[in-house]
A protein has these predicted regions:
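Cyclophilin-like peptidyl-prolyl cis-trans isomerases
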Residues: 17-228
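Sec-dependent N-terminal signal peptides
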Residues: 3-13
């Protein structure tokens, strides 16, 4: 057990460190879903996305919304305000948001490892700045990769980004050990990660879906809650 002296010294040091530089001071949001709880830590290095997400949660924006787009071995997506009262089979995910958030792509610091929380956005043809939706987000599940698969992912990234996005050795190890979706790296803002409930994400990404990737049986966010 730490001595009182060490504890006091630790408290003194951490009190002098700005919040945005201290991982332990990250905000944590819990999504209470019909499949279980998912706890998300928000990155202080992406303050625009962090603050926007916290504001949405405080407003109750996500309460009652569906995971309207689910792709097995890829990701689960929510944030469409029309999903709250959607009829069975209704196509979702195309609601027009009133605002967008400037991209905060911090690659390679943050990348699309399994459990990553990222902002959805419009395509490059109409959104070359890669600005994010202020509302819609996704949580990565992905898959585990071997070196040959990662080489193919890098070749795709080289072509798509004109060689601007390179997988790092550390990132490759994460994709081999934990999994994720490297083909999205450097293209979307990753602003948090799953710290508990990855088993819930796994369960959701396995559900049966229709031709529009909407789950046949609704998977709903009952309530989003700020824990810290």
């Amino acid at each position: 057990m730490r001595t009182l002296l060490l504890l006091c010294a630790f408290c003194l040091v951490t009190s002098l460190v700005p919040a945005q530089e201290t991982d332990s001071l990250r905000h944590v949001v819990c999504l209470h879903t019909t499949k279980g709880d998912i706890k998300l830590a928000l990155y202080n290095e992406t303050p625009l996305h962090r603050d926007n997400f916290l504001r949405k949660v405080r407003q109750g924006y996500y309460d009652g919304q569906l995971f309207h787009r689910v792709i097995s071995g890829f990701m689960i997506q929510s944030g469409d305000s029309l999903s709250r009262h959607a009829q069975p089979g209704q196509k979702l995910g195309e609601s027009i948001e009133s605002q967008e958030i400037p991209a905060e792509i911090r690659y390679p610091l943050f990348f699309h490892k399994r459990g990553a929380l990222a902002a959805a956005r419009r395509g490059d043809d109409v959104n070359p700045e890669k600005s994010s939706s202020e509302a819609q987000f996704y949580i990565v599940y992905g898959r585990r990769y071997d070196d040959a698969m990662l080489d193919k992912a890098q070749a795709w990234l080289d072509e798509y980004t004109q060689g601007k996005v390179k997988l790092t050795p550390a990132g490759r190890e994460v994709y081999k050990r934990i999994g994720g979706t490297p083909s999205l790296d450097g293209q979307y803002t990753v602003f948090g990660e799953t710290i508990e409930g990855l088993d819930v994400v796994k369960e959701i990404q396995w559900v049966d879906t229709d031709d529009n990737d909407r789950p046949l049986e609704d998977v709903r966010i009952l309530k989003a809650e700020i824990l810290q």
